[in-house]
Amino acid sequence: MPRLSEAEIAEQLAQRPDWSLENNEIVRTFRLANFPAAIAFVTHVAFLAEAAGHHPDIDIRYNRVRLALTTHDAGGLTEKDFALAAAIDEIMG
């Protein structure tokens, strides 16, 4: 899958305002009710990621979960990253 251009990334980010661009990754931090809720959320993300064959970097800090997406094989952001971001956003409603 080809890397997205800067213009394509900006267009995609406009549709995902809760995500931001940091060092060739898109990132979002989620705040959950408590630690068990954070783990349940991460488990749901894990199943989505496995089904997509695309896995985020995950950082859990009590009730906060930071997700970072990039396509390592492409050396940057691709449609895969934004498709998974959209699926993750759907979980949160």
From Swiss-Prot:
GO terms assigned for molecular function: 4-alpha-hydroxytetrahydrobiopterin dehydratase activity
Please tell me which top-level EC class this enzyme sits in.
Answer: lyase
Query: What EC number(s) is this enzyme filed under?
Result: 4.2.1.96
What's in the keyword line of the UniProt record? Lyase
Please write the reaction equations for the catalytic activity of this protein: (4aS,6R)-4a-hydroxy-L-erythro-5,6,7,8-tetrahydrobiopterin = (6R)-L-erythro-6,7-dihydrobiopterin + H2O
Q: State any GO BP term from the record.
A: tetrahydrobiopterin biosynthetic process
Regarding protein family, the annotation reads: Belongs to the pterin-4-alpha-carbinolamine dehydratase family.
NCBIfam families attached to this UniProt entry:
PRK00823.1-2
Q: What is this protein called?
A: Putative pterin-4-alpha-carbinolamine dehydratase
